């Protein structure tokens, strides 16, 4: 909160590590959602990609968090197709495609690649899911100096794009 005039939303969970997500003590989850209540802000549950061995435990944890803290969790960010289908079908809240959902190429060894304008696109397999409006937002990394979002806007005029910056 330091240096910010206001907080609009709290992102709770993990983009990258399923073990971090699964091993987080209940106290930490309760404190995070209590902070949301105190500040009067909603929470986004950020869900990592689970391995097959952790999938059942991951789904169970998501159930407990969404149903147990549904008064503040109004959005879920997922990072793979399977979890997208699971969350869209099971929960009545907004679903976002996370940063790992559609990784863009980037490599710091190729400066020219970063300096180019890059068109952000969705794989053809997923365009119908996005077109139907089941995904409300997409998160991307600043992989290039300029990102062209026109194809996304044309495909999904309702979409909200979040760019993660350092």
Role assignments for model-derived ranges:
Residues 1-166:
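Active-site pocket-lining/capping segments in soluble small-molecule metabolic enzymes
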């Amino acid at each position: 909160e330091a240096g910010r005039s206001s907080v609009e939303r709290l992102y709770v969970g993990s983009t990258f590590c399923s073990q971090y997500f699964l091993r987080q003590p209940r106290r930490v989850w309760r404190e995070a959602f209590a902070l949301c209540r105190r500040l009067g802000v909603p929470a986004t549950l950020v869900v990592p990609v689970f391995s097959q061995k952790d999938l059942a435990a991951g789904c169970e944890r998501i159930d407990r968090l969404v149903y147990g803290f549904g008064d503040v969790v109004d959005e879920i960010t997922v990072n793979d197709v399977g979890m997208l289908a699971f969350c869209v079908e099971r929960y009545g809240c907004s679903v976002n495609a996370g940063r790992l959902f559609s990784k863009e190429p980037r490599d710091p060894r190729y400066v020219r690649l970063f300096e180019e304008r890059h068109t952000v696109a969705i794989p053809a397999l997923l365009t119908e899911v996005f077109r139907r409006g089941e995904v409300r937002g997409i998160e991307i990394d600043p992989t290039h100096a300029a990102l062209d979002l026109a194809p996304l806007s044309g495909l999904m005029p309702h979409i909200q794009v979040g760019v993660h910056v350092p």
